[in-house]
């Protein structure tokens, strides 16, 4: 069971050995079916500004300083993941979640890193409307409903 970054390393190494050297690596996971061309182009533009590793991110409504908790296994008590004196969500630092719209990196960044976080990564903010990451059945059903609704709108425009 390899993690995604290890799979990228393997794919890049295999491609170099079997196809030849190349400059850039991009991953567009199928778990982000709501991605748009413009969101991918936005990542490419940021990558083109001499950023060797770019990933898409979106603002999250969850925050380790305010509403993410850890539950004790013995007594079910809860505590903040990152204890703080913040009492209002508006005062909490802005937090982003990586979303699989696009991952773009120089080939050597993938090969040389020991793990995903071993070096600088630039986050490109994308809208939460397209940031669905299908991890479970509910995510799938949500994405399916959005796509069906978009298709119905397109059909109305054609008629």
List each model region and its residues.
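Conserved core of the sugar-phosphate nucleotidyltransferase
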Residues: 1-10, 24, 33-126
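Helix-loop-strand module that forms the ligand-binding subsite of alpha/beta enzymes
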Residues: 30
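Short amphipathic alpha-helix with an adjacent loop that forms part of the alpha/beta core around
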Residues: 9-17
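Hydrophobic helical membrane-anchoring modules
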Residues: 123-125, 129-159
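Short acidic donor-binding loop at the edge of a beta-strand
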Residues: 16-26
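Active-site catalytic microenvironments for nucleophilic, acid-base chemistry
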Residues: 14, 46, 146-149
């Amino acid at each position: 069971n390899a993690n995604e970054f290890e799979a990228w390393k393997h794919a890049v190494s295999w491609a170099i050995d079997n196809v030849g050297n190349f400059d850039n690596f991009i991953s567009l996971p199928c778990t982000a079916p709501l991605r748009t061309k413009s969101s991918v182009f936005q990542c490419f533009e940021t990558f083109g500004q001499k950023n060797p590793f770019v990933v898409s991110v979106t603002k999250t409504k969850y925050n380790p300083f305010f509403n993410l908790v850890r539950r004790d296994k013995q007594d079910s008590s809860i505590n903040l993941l990152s204890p703080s004196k913040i009492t209002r969500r508006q005062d909490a630092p802005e937090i982003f979640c990586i979303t699989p719209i696009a991952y773009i990196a120089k080939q050597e960044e993938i090969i040389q890193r020991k793990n995903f976080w071993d070096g600088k990564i630039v986050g490109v903010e994308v809208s939460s409307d397209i940031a669905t990451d299908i991890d479970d059945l509910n995510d799938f059903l949500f994405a399916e409903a959005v796509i069906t609704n978009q298709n119905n709108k397109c059909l109305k425009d054609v008629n």
